[in-house]
């Protein structure tokens, strides 16, 4: 399962991902298994035991949603875990501790000095063997991690493997949207770093008609294209090197790229920041940060949404957590909701964007809110 949920003060802040897997869990329990073992990661402990990333706070929320007790084990592999699982009875539900507390899950760890350390292949093999020993068949309901070559995804060696209901629902939505979209097809990308979204941008250029690039990652594009001063805005040096390549591909494919033309800037990231509007010509002065789309950009984005019949959105347009930098993302969501009501298909993904949708109480106003995205 993908129970990689945000925590606050030791409690689950947003249970969406847990709720997503409840139908699969209930279906399995209806079959009267001897036991059901749930495994997940939470955050990025980088192969080390980091208490703030423990799965333990998930237990009360999971018990509440299922209406039954859940047993928590403080590790995910090893003799004690194997014994506890072996002795389970009467459909007992067991939640394992964070898989990523072990370097063998991701194949690497980060040591105290901040260096990447490759996991020992023999240890990885043992880790996978221990996970495999915990069950007789394997169900993958973790859409958010299904693309990763991690031990829990690819190393659990059971002849019977199945997709859970959540994974199926996600794949059905995405395959329809990506393989036979109603056109025009618009993708909206935001967030901080270009390099994190290179593969996504490249693959979407092959499929879409228009692409909005906003949020922090837009400034790397604008600096490369217009040599624009971006002040203290986010800049991705690695991403900068491949902007030309991405734009050339878009041009060759006839994909229209929309970048911001003006920006709401702040002199800090905080709620009490002073604000100014800047544009492509003025650039952003030193000491100022582009934190949201400006009014002209908001209007241009609205026009692009109004033309679209399929919309996939991953990544906010600004620092929406602060009210004064929320309008670009909130207005875009309003436009996407209206377009959905008029018959368009809309898919929202990525942790931050999903948070925005929930805060704006718009979950029912878009076609599908994906559990994918995030760490």
Swiss-Prot record:
GO terms (BP aspect): gluconeogenesis; glycolytic process
Organism for this UniProt entry: Tetrahymena pyriformis
Family named by the database record: Belongs to the phosphoglycerate kinase family.
Protein name as it appears in the record: Phosphoglycerate kinase
Any one GO MF annotation of this record: phosphoglycerate kinase activity
Residues binding AMP, per UniProt: 192-193, 197, 216, 290, 321
Keywords, ordered alphabetically: ATP-binding, Glycolysis, Kinase, Magnesium, Metal-binding, Nucleotide-binding, Transferase
Signal sequence, start to end: none
Binding site residues for Mg(2+): 192, 196, 352
Binding site for ADP: 191, 215, 320
Subunit-level organization: Monomer.
Gene that produces this protein: PGK
